[in-house]
Amino acid sequence: MVVPIGINGFGRIGRLVLRASLENPECRVLAINEPFMDVKYMVYMFKYDSTHGRFKGTVEDINGEFVVNGNKIHVFAEKDPANIKWSSVGAEYIVESTGLFLSTEKAGVHLKGGAKKVVISAPSTDAPMYVMGVNEETYESSHDVISNASCTTNCLAPLAKIIHENFGIVEGLMTTVHAITATQKTVDGPSGKDWRAGRSALSNIIPASTGAAKAVGKVLPALNGKLTGMSFRVPNCDVSVVDLTVRLEKKATYEEIKKVMKAASESDKYKRYIGYTEDEVVSTDFIGDTHSSIFDAHAGIALNDNFVKLVSWYDNEMGYSTRVIDLLVYISKKN
């Protein structure tokens, strides 16, 4: 069965989810809802990408139809998601990627239009969160609206899981050095309660809050209350990096930790989600990398055998978007 997908919102994640879907023969995007672009502009935005480069296939506007690699994708232009008739084009699994409808109630309106399941491409206020390689096996088919968590949680959770299963995590702090996102400002401007967030993304390293570390406790209950963290937003268009500093229950040399992470990256269970490198890499080396988390063996350090700093990279756009597709395909099989 080819999973029939609809995408609500054709922004950064929406467009990259479409790109990711084209690399997975188990799914096909049948429809996109985008009320703020006409088809010609959608073609342009999909064809040219300042970060990931020009789309290597074909994308056309043919008589008002959005056509990618010869396949027509129906375009809706509904501002109210409750009015999208997904069933009219056979789209059953919906990606909610507007960033606006983050609760079970708000994202659940897609079900009125014929959707069977909805995956929110962001942390949700109340929907169950799943991270591939971590807790997807706990998914229950009764859950119609779920969340793919955040890009940072997708990087951190697999790393934390493997370390905890092998050495035990007593407690830890995470910092993500995070690329800029669309919510930030190019020049200084007003920003409500978070004044620092209103400063220019192009000129500053901006400390910010993140719920990514605490969210690990939701997908890995054994670590609930043991992790917290923060973010530094940096002037970088894509690719972020997690710095996880943990106190271990079981003594381990850094070489032993490296061996465990390398083995995980080569295992059938984790190799799609976890990468491993001993190269002298920098952030641009990971643009387009579809792993959730790439362990940097040469970047981490140990103070002693119980206290270590671990470093793992992630393409916060392409890696995350690929996981959205993986989650959709996974739940379709469970259903």
Swiss-Prot record:
MF-aspect GO terms: glyceraldehyde-3-phosphate dehydrogenase (NAD+) (phosphorylating) activity; NAD binding; NADP binding
Residues that coordinate or bind NAD(+): 12-13, 34, 79, 316
Keywords: Cytoplasm, Glycolysis, NAD, Oxidoreductase
EC number from the UniProt entry: 1.2.1.12
Entry annotation: catalytic residues: 151
Catalysed reactions, as listed in the record: D-glyceraldehyde 3-phosphate + phosphate + NAD(+) = (2R)-3-phospho-glyceroyl phosphate + NADH + H(+)
Localization per Swiss-Prot or TrEMBL: Cytoplasm
GO biological process: gluconeogenesis; glycolytic process
Pathway in which the depicted protein is active: Carbohydrate degradation; glycolysis; pyruvate from D-glyceraldehyde 3-phosphate: step 1/5
GO CC annotation: cytoplasm; cytosol; extracellular matrix; phagocytic vesicle
Site (Activates thiol group during catalysis): 178
Enzyme's top EC category: oxidoreductase
InterPro entries registered for this protein in UniProt: GlycerAld/Erythrose_P_DH, GlycerAld_3-P_DH_AS, GlycerAld_3-P_DH_cat, GlycerAld_3-P_DH_NAD(P)-bd, Glyceraldehyde-3-P_DH_1, NAD(P)-bd_dom_sf
Binding site for D-glyceraldehyde 3-phosphate: 150-152, 181, 210-211, 233
Subunit and partners: Homotetramer.
Family of the protein in this entry: Belongs to the glyceraldehyde-3-phosphate dehydrogenase family.
Name of the featured protein: Glyceraldehyde-3-phosphate dehydrogenase
Gene name tied to this protein: gpdA
